[in-house]
């Protein structure tokens, strides 16, 4: 029986927080700690929190409380760890004074120091070898690749910069090495994430790095090209998330549409537009020219007809009039966005939007969100129906006796739709998790597809 100390782990929040969790767990395993799947089997528990919106704050506080009740020894990290209460003290320590330690996000060193203080590491840290790709919390065939930390924007509805700081880009060589190790470990899809993927390299003035003797600028377009070249060697996909609509995005579209990276740099953009009316965007401190955005979307699709655009929006922002909301609905219809999410505006403690005039009642905010989603789902359904009859490349995520569940290039894991694939009729057509298969699409609803190999 192993005598290695055991650490339980609870990971909450977005994919960027998940990457932080993976880095902490990788370091724990590298030092010889075991990861426990239960509270009672752990010597202590680490909880990685989210603090972006009120619901996430409460979920994190509840998770900390549960860990304290079930285990008693808890270290807290993540975005909520950087959040203050109304009295100015640390929120977590105020609500849960029995926690052993609290750190902010992206704090692997601080977390490990806290773990060492309360659960000394074993004498032989090399008992278990950690794979070069690190410990992953995602399925083996896809992984998130975080290229930077923090954000230079000051959107009025957001408190991320106050928790994660200004933009800090990872060195190109470091990013490429991680990507290569992930592909070597069997990853078939790499999801590039950050708080602001388009701004990669701004903080270091796009300095030139080197990978395998080749110069690569610390810049989104150059990094995507390098990742596309690497993905092509392994027959894999690269998908871009959190792409702020800078002009530089225009340079990435051709990489998706033609040349050696086509089919590897996926024709998929996750662009958080947030709204379409210039006055609302101005109050949000976001780019404020919807007409130019429409022109760019149309231009992107001229260059890359297969492009899928995902976006998120906020309905019921302070001061939003009915006319301004109708402008947003018109934008959704004209832009024909493929995948859309919408939040009813929710005040976030510490956000400057709380100081704006014109706060709308809860029922108005929720009613506008519902109307928005009704229009967005109609647009999405119309676009997805166009895929019926086509044969598409599908990455298989699950397999059972009933068949398989996979995703096309248009579908990111967990947030987009899926393809339900019929069981293979012939042994030669059987598939397993992580396989790419050609699927003829036979049906669709407003969100998902059905097909056969």
From Swiss-Prot:
Entry's family note: Belongs to the methylthiotransferase family. RimO subfamily.
Free-text comment on the cofactor: Binds 2 [4Fe-4S] clusters. One cluster is coordinated with 3 cysteines and an exchangeable S-adenosyl-L-methionine.
Binding site for [4Fe-4S] cluster 1: 14, 50, 79
Name used for this protein in its record: Ribosomal protein uS12 methylthiotransferase RimO
Intracellular or extracellular location(s): Cytoplasm
PROSITE patterns: MTTASE_N (PS51449), MTTASE_RADICAL (PS01278), RADICAL_SAM (PS51918), TRAM (PS50926)
Source organism, top-level taxon: Bacteria
Gene that produces this protein: rimO
Function summary: Catalyzes the methylthiolation of an aspartic acid residue of ribosomal protein uS12.
Cystine pairings recorded for this chain: none
Cofactor(s) demanded: [4Fe-4S] cluster
Pfam families documented for this protein: Radical_SAM, TRAM_2, UPF0004
Binding site for [4Fe-4S] cluster 2: 151, 155, 158
Catalytic reactions of this protein: L-aspartate(89)-[ribosomal protein uS12]-hydrogen + (sulfur carrier)-SH + AH2 + 2 S-adenosyl-L-methionine = 3-methylsulfanyl-L-aspartate(89)-[ribosomal protein uS12]-hydrogen + (sulfur carrier)-H + 5'-deoxyadenosine + L-methionine + A + S-adenosyl-L-homocysteine + 2 H(+)
Limits of the Radical SAM core domain: 137-382
Gene Ontology terms describing biological process: tRNA modification
Organism (species): Burkholderia lata (strain ATCC 17760 / DSM 23089 / LMG 22485 / NCIMB 9086 / R18194 / 383)
Domain (MTTase N-terminal): residue spans on this chain: 5-120
Gene Ontology MF terms: 4 iron, 4 sulfur cluster binding; aspartic acid methylthiotransferase activity; metal ion binding; protein methylthiotransferase activity
Lineage: Bacteria, Pseudomonadati, Pseudomonadota, Betaproteobacteria, Burkholderiales
Domain TRAM: 385-453
Enzyme Commission (EC) number: 2.8.4.4
GO cellular component, as recorded: cytosol
Alphabetical keyword list: 4Fe-4S, Cytoplasm, Iron, Iron-sulfur, Metal-binding, S-adenosyl-L-methionine, Transferase
């Amino acid at each position: 029986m192993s005598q290695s100390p055991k650490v339980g782990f609870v990971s909450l929040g977005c994919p960027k927080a998940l990457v932080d969790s993976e880095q902490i767990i990788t370091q724990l395993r590298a030092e010889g700690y075991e990861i426990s799947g239960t509270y009672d089997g752990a010597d202590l528990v680490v909880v990685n929190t989210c603090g972006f919106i009120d619901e996430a704050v409460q979920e994190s506080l509840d998770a900390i409380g549960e860990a304290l009740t079930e285990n008693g020894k808890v270290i807290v990290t993540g975005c909520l760890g950087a959040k203050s209460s109304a009295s100015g003290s640390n929120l977590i320590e105020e609500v849960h004074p029995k926690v052993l330690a609290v750190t902010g996000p992206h704090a692997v060193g601080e977390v490990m120091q806290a773990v060492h203080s309360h659960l000394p590491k074993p004498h032989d840290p090399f008992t278990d070898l950690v794979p070069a790709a690190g410990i992953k919390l995602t399925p083996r065939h896809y992984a998130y690749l975080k290229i930077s930390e923090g954000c230079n924007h000051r959107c009025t509805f957001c408190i991320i910069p106050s928790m994660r700081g200004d933009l800090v880009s990872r060195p190109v060589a470091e990013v490429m090495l991680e990507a290569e190790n992930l592909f070597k470990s069997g990853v078939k899809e790499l999801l590039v994430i950050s708080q602001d993927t388009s701004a990669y390299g701004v903080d270091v003035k796009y300095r030139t790095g080197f990978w395998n003797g080749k110069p690569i600028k610390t810049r989104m377009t150059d990094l995507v090209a390098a990742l596309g070249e690497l993905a092509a060697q392994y027959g894999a996909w690269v998908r871009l998330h959190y792409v702020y609509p800078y002009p530089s995005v225009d340079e990435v579209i051709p990489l998706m549409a033609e040349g050696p990276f086509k089919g590897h740099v996926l024709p998929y953009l996750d662009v958080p537009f947030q709204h379409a009316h210039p006055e609302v965007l101005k109050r949000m401190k976001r780019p404020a020219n919807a007409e130019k955005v429409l022109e760019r979307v149309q231009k992107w699709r001229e260059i890359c007809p297969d492009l899928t655009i995902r976006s998120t929006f906020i309905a019921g922002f302070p001061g939003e009039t009915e006319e301004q909301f109708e402008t947003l609905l018109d934008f959704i219809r004209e832009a024909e966005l493929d995948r859309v999410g919408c939040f009813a505006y929710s005040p976030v403690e510490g956000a400057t939007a709380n100081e704006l005039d014109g706060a709308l009642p809860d029922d108005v905010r929720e009613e506008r969100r519902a109307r928005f989603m009704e229009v967005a789902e109609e647009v999405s359904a119309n676009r997805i129906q166009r895929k019926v009859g086509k044969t598409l490349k599908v990455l298989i995520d699950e397999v059972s006796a009933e068949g398989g569940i996979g995703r096309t290039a248009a579908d990111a894991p967990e947030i987009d739709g899926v393809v339900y694939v019929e069981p293979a009729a012939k042994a030669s057509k059987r598939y397993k998790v992580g396989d790419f298969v050609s699927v003829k699409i036979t049906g669709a609803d407003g969100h998902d597809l059905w097909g056969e190999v």
